[in-house]
C-alpha cells in the first residue's frame, strides 16, 4: 500500500510556482519565502498568484484590475493596483525592496521574476 501511495504521489506532484525564494502553492493558498509562511489578504494573494502564473510577462494595470477586481476600473480608485502592489512588496520582499521580485515596467505595468541585482 505504501509503495502504491509513493507511486501516485510521484505521478501527481503538488502544483507550485516559484520565483527565487518565493513559493506559492495554489491548492493550499499558501505563500512562503524560504521556509517562512507569508500572511496575505485575499486580494494580495490573488494578485501574487496572477503575477506568478504569468511569470515574466508584463501585466497592465487595466488587465490586473479586470482580472483581480472583476471590473473595468469604473468603481475602483486609480491607484488601487499600485497600493496593493506596494503592500504585497512589503510582505514578500526582503526589507521591502522596491524592485525585487515584482518589477515596474515603466509606462506598461508590472511583472514578476528573479530579483534584479
What is each PLM-predicted segment?
Residues 30-42, 46-100, 105-106:
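Positively charged, aromatic-enriched patches within helix-turn-helix-type DNA-binding elements
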Residues 19, 23-45, 111-117:
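A structural micro-motif at secondary-structure boundaries
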Residues 1-18:
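Basic, amphipathic DNA-recognition helix from helix-turn-helix-like DNA-binding domains
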